[in-house]
């Protein structure tokens, strides 16, 4: 390897008489987390070389040499042959070193003209995030599909619906499962909306003030798959709201999975007995032979805190930074890289867990009326007979009190007991005191009636497919 400057492995050094101290370098180095940007450095460098050529700052022959060298460097990065050295300060310095080793300092040293690490890293980070969020979006659709699959497998299964963790009203299991799919689809919609702001290129902004070399930021933006170049070079190099927004969306995905995980943890307990976990997606105990632990769900719940922490930490880093670029912004990448890494572990595991759950429909049905979940149906039956809801609510509550004192269900009250509460409670009220009737009666849009849940499932599946197609569409041609 040749030596090419005062501070080898970095992009600065001429005004310094020596390199940084060991402790200073240890603090400054970032290749252990920014190396994910290396493939994007190659793509952006090719685009930059072309605009240098267009501006007559790079000859045709030098352009050809440089593009060939960048091709070789890109392949070496992809294969793992080229890696950062301990002396490389960051991905940018390492990649310049690699290019110069291939094409020599005369040609390789020209690439830096008109660009700064400030606009470079802001652009590469956006490029990496745009690809990474599409990968996450695709995996989220697979979890949504697993929920829809289970809904299809159990179209008529009835379970207890809860509010405040207390028995509320009977609902279809499919309705409950699809209720977990909906926020995940909104998460993908947030990703798509976020992508509009990610699709603005800071390249050409220089350190902060733009470039005097008559380069073409729009040409670079177009080649790299962006919608446009940024409108303000100071903002382009120093803003990381896109990173904070990314951290939020990733944390929200984890939160939505954590809510599902929490339910699965309870559902598989003997006390609930709703589901049995697949052996492939559970673990045992080192001392208790009978245990079958919901580790996937618990790790999802635990790692969600980690993603929330990444968001909180990034927001704290970004606050109160003056314009323009500050070195604090080096801290923007680690939490984002980590959040993506955690979701890449969690999403396939949760998808596997959900798709292999065995639901016990008889158990769900037996618990559906427990806790007097048909009380609302009784009250609404009275409303349909012309009774004001306030009176109907009181009467239904009185029926619950009698049934509770006897240890029976509402459907087991005698005709005399019903009439003693309100003479308008005739024997016909028994037609609504079944969980099947209660579920079927809730046929408004979004309700738990089978016909409505089937509509929901169809929309979930079509939306998931649409989002899948978006996620699979390459950012760059």
Swiss-Prot record:
Asked if the Swiss-Prot or TrEMBL record annotates the protein with the keyword Cytoplasm, the reply is yes
- Pathway stated in the Swiss-Prot or TrEMBL entry: Amino-acid biosynthesis; L-arginine biosynthesis; L-arginine from L-ornithine and carbamoyl phosphate: step 3/3
Instruction: Offer one example of a GO biological process linked to this entry.
Output: L-arginine biosynthetic process
Specify one Pfam family.
Lyase_1
What are the annotated GO cellular component locations?
cytosol
Molecular-function annotations in GO:
argininosuccinate lyase activity
Q: What is its EC number?
A: 4.3.2.1
Q: Which reaction does it catalyse?
A: 2-(N(omega)-L-arginino)succinate = fumarate + L-arginine
Question: Which EC class, in a word?
Answer: lyase
* Compartments where found: Cytoplasm
UniProt entry tagged with the keyword Amino-acid biosynthesis: yes
Q: Which domain of life is it from?
A: Bacteria
Query: Which NCBIfam families does this entry report, sorted A to Z?
Result: argH (TIGR00838)
Family, per entry:
Belongs to the lyase 1 family. Argininosuccinate lyase subfamily.
Q: What is this protein called?
A: Argininosuccinate lyase
User: Which organism was this protein described from?
Assistant: Corynebacterium diphtheriae (strain ATCC 700971 / NCTC 13129 / Biotype gravis)
Its lineage reads: Bacteria, Bacillati, Actinomycetota, Actinomycetes, Mycobacteriales
Q: Which gene encodes it?
A: argH
């Amino acid at each position: 390897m040749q030596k090419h400057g005062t501070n080898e492995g970095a992009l600065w050094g001429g005004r310094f008489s020596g390199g940084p101290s060991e402790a200073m370098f240890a603090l400054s180095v970032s290749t252990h987390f920014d190396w994910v940007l290396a493939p994007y450095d190659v793509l952006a460098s090719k685009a930059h070389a072309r605009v240098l050529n267009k501006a007559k700052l790079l000859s045709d022959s030098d352009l050809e040499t440089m593009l060939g060298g960048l091709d070789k460097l890109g392949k070496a990065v992809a294969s793992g042959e080229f890696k950062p050295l301990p002396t490389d300060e960051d991905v940018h310095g390492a990649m310049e070193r690699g290019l110069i080793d291939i094409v020599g300092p005369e040609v390789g040293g020209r690439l830096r003209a008109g660009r700064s690490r400030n606009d470079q890293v802001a652009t590469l980070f956006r490029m990496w995030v745009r690809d990474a969020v599409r990968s996450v979006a695709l995996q989220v659709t697979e979890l949504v599909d697993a929920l829809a699959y289970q809904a299809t497998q159990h179209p008529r299964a009835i379970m207890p619906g809860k509010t405040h963790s207390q028995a509320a009203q009977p609902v279809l299991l499919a309705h409950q499962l699809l209720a977990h799919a909906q926020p995940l689809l909104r998460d993908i919609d947030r990703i798509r909306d976020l992508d509009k702001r990610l699709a603005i290129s800071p390249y050409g902004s220089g350190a902060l003030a733009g470039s005097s070399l008559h380069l073409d930021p729009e040409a670079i933006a177009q080649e790299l798959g962006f919608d446009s170049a940024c409108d303000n070079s100071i903002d382009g190099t120093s803003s990381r709201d896109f990173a904070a927004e990314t951290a939020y969306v990733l944390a929200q995905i984890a939160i939505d999975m954590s809510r599902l995980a929490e339910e699965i943890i309870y559902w598989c307990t003997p006390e609930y007995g709703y589901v049995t976990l697949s052996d492939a997606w559970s673990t045992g105990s080192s001392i208790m032979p009978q245990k079958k632990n919901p580790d996937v769900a618990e790790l999802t719940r635990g790692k969600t805190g980690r993603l929330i922490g990444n968001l909180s930490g990034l927001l704290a880093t970004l606050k109160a930074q003056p314009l323009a670029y500050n070195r604090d912004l080096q801290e923007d990448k680690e939490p984002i890289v980590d959040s993506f890494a955690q979701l890449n572990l969690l999403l396939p595991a949760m998808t596997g867990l959900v798709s292999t759950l065995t639901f016990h429909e008889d158990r769900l049905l037996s618990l559906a009326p427990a806790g007097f979940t048909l009380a609302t149906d009784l009250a609404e039956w009275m409303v349909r007979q012309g009774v004001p809801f306030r009176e109907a609510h009181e009467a239904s509550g009185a029926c619950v009190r009698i049934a509770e004192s006897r240890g029976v269900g509402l459907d087991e009250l005698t005709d005399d007991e019903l009439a003693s509460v309100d003479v308008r409670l005739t024997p016909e009220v028994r037609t609504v005191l079944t969980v099947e009737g209660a579920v079927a009666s809730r046929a408004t849009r979004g309700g738990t009636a089978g016909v409505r849940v089937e509509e929901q499932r169809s929309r979930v599946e079509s939306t998931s497919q649409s989002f899948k197609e978006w996620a699979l569409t390459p950012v760059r041609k």
